[in-house]
């Protein structure tokens, strides 16, 4: 069989297995996830041995230190993967939940019931922990999942997927409900994206180039998990102590994640006082600032920002900064340059906070809180598959419910349409 034929078979088998997954009880799904967690912990030496092969190959290819760190698995990270499986097992099962019921004038009762999406394709890079994280969420929501990890993690991903599939076999659950595309070539991704007959949705997780490639080549609907160009606007009525604390946390706690702050906007009425203060605080923490002319007027030595800086997701200790005339200009800047991810306003003005919440288009909008709260666990959703920047079908951190859809259910007593 050719690569194209093999991938088509994987997708077709996943479609067949998805029907069995949709029927599986919550208890059966939870037992599976708990056994999977135990299997990962019990086989940590196998996983780390395969991971060592990937790390060695990555070093030979000249992967960056940051990439190698994302790729690396040790005992503590494997335990975290196992704990993640247990956390998903403990979450309420959304499948079969009836979310609304209402009675029509003709006495039929109408409701909406949560059902699995079907077959979910996940395309991701570097992090082999996504193999177990994504599998857990998709399976708990009653879906089949087709995984395609990065070529740099092929041995790690195959080892993890193999251990998870072993537990499915032992419980009599179709192994095809959890499939890993074993072909590291980019052609494997291209063929996967052609399987619209069998795969219901594609969720890509990775860098900007991967997302663009998937969107341009997919025949299947895509839920984009695009870059995080996250903003904070310091309003004229902001408490400076609060603003400084939130900005530092948003930018420096974990600068390499998608909910880290990338652009700071400051109201002109407080620029003369606040810009020098935040410049000093961030410089002490080794943050490189790139400012517009108005910002640099109060922060000598700051590098001039270019148009490209307003679009940039730095993922490091670099921050673009701009002084704006008012709330209108702040909102306009965010809606022009943002990536629909996460934005915050620091203000004591209730009316301004409400306008910001209503008019900013992003998936998570905060008032007087760090952008780092844009996370499924932090928002009370439990584990997440990622943060969607696509308004259809889900927007923002995607938990279990977002891996389902709804259907209408109708109860009658013999009614016919007149």
Swiss-Prot record:
Pfam families in UniProt: Aldedh
Q: Which pathway does the database say it acts in?
A: Amino-acid biosynthesis; L-proline biosynthesis; L-glutamate 5-semialdehyde from L-glutamate: step 2/2
Please describe what this protein does. Catalyzes the NADPH-dependent reduction of L-glutamate 5-phosphate into L-glutamate 5-semialdehyde and phosphate. The product spontaneously undergoes cyclization to form 1-pyrroline-5-carboxylate.
Q: GO cellular component annotations, sorted alphabetically?
A: cytoplasm
Q: Which NCBIfam families match?
A: PRK00197.1 (NF001221), proA (TIGR00407)
What organism is the protein native to?
Answer: Geotalea daltonii (strain DSM 22248 / JCM 15807 / FRC-32) (Geobacter daltonii)
Q: Where is the signal peptide?
A: none
Query: Know the name of this protein?
Result: Gamma-glutamyl phosphate reductase
This enzyme's EC code(s): 1.2.1.41
Q: Where in the cell is it found?
A: Cytoplasm
GO biological process entries: L-proline biosynthetic process
Family, according to the entry, reads as follows: Belongs to the gamma-glutamyl phosphate reductase family.
Q: Which GO terms describe its molecular function?
A: glutamate-5-semialdehyde dehydrogenase activity; NADP binding
Cited InterPro entries:
Ald_DH/histidinol_DH, Ald_DH_C, Ald_DH_N, Aldehyde_DH_dom, G-glutamylP_reductase_CS, Glu-5-SA_DH, GPR_dom
Its encoding gene is what?
proA
Which keywords, in A-to-Z order, does the entry hold?
Amino-acid biosynthesis, Cytoplasm, NADP, Oxidoreductase, Proline biosynthesis
Main localization category = cytoplasm
Return the broad EC class: oxidoreductase
Q: Which reaction does it catalyse?
A: L-glutamate 5-semialdehyde + phosphate + NADP(+) = L-glutamyl 5-phosphate + NADPH + H(+)
């Amino acid at each position: 069989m050719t690569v194209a034929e093999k991938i088509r078979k994987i997708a077709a088998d996943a479609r067949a297995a998805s029907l069995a997954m949709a029927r599986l009880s919550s208890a059966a799904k939870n037992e599976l996830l708990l056994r999977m967690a135990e299997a990962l912990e019990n086989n940590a030496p196998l996983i780390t041995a395969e991971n060592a092969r990937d790390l060695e190959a990555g070093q030979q290819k000249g992967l960056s230190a940051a990439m190698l760190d994302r790729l690396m698995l040790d005992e503590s990270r494997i335990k975290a993967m196992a704990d993640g499986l247990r956390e998903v097992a403990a979450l309420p099962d959304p499948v079969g939940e009836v979310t609304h019921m209402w009675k029509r004038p003709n006495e039929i009762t109408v409701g909406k019931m949560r059902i699995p999406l079907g077959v979910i394709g996940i395309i991701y890079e570097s992090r082999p922990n996504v193999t177990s994280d994504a599998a857990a969420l998709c399976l708990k929501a009653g879906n089949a999942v087709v995984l395609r990890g990065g070529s740099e993690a092929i041995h790690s991903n195959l080892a993890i997927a193999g251990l998870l599939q072993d537990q499915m076999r032992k419980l009599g659950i179709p192994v095809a409900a959890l499939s890993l595309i074993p072909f590291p070539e980019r052609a494997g991704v291209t063929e996967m994206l052609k399987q619209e007959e069998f795969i219901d949705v594609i969720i890509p997780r990775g860098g900007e180039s991967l997302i663009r490639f998937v969107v341009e080549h997919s025949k299947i609907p895509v839920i984009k998990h695009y870059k995080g160009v996250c903003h904070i606007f310091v309003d004229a009525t902001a408490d400076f102590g609060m603003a400084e604390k939130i900005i530092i946390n948003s930018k420096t706690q974990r600068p390499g994640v998608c909910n880290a702050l990338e652009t700071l906007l400051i109201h002109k009425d407080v620029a003369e006082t606040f810009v020098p203060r935040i410049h000093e605080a961030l410089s002490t923490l080794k943050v490189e600032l790139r400012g517009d002319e108005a910002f640099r007027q109060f922060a000598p030595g700051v590098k001039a920002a270019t148009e490209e800086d307003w679009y940039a997701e730095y993922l490091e200790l670099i921050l673009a900064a701009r002084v704006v005339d008012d709330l209108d200009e702040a909102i306009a800047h965010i809606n022009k340059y943002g990536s629909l991810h996460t934005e915050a306003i620091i203000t004591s003005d209730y009316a301004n906070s409400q306008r910001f919440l209503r008019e900013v288009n992003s998936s998570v909008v905060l008032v007087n809180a760090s952008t780092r709260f844009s996370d499924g666990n932090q928002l009370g959703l439990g584990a997440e598959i990622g943060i969607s920047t696509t308004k259809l079908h889900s927007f923002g951190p995607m938990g279990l419910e977002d891996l389902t859809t709804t259907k209408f259910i109708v109860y009658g007593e013999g009614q016919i349409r007149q």
